[in-house]
Amino acid sequence: PGPCNCIETNVCICGTGCSGKCCQCGDACKCASGCGCSGCKVVCRCSGTCACGCDCTGPTNCKCDSGCSCK
């Protein structure tokens, strides 16, 4: 559904064919919009068709596109 922006548990691997944009390993595992990542335990999803920002690392500090909310 949405991008996987999450806290790393082991290693961050963005899904096949996904852009490496926003993808980091360390404190957080972040993949480009529409991509999934493995080795994660916290996922932020924005409502509807909205995308989460690259700095989203979980429900407590989730930032979504204007006019959208996080779950």
Swiss-Prot record:
Induction (free text): By cadmium.
Keywords noted in UniProt: Cadmium, Metal-binding, Metal-thiolate cluster
Residues the record lists as binding Cd(2+) 5: C46, C50, C52, C56
Positions bound to Cd(2+) 4: C44, C56, C62, C70
Alphabetized GO MF terms: metal ion binding
Positions of Cd(2+) 1 binding: C14, C18, C31, C35
Family: Belongs to the metallothionein superfamily. Type 2 family.
Protein name in UniProt: Metallothionein 20-III isoform B
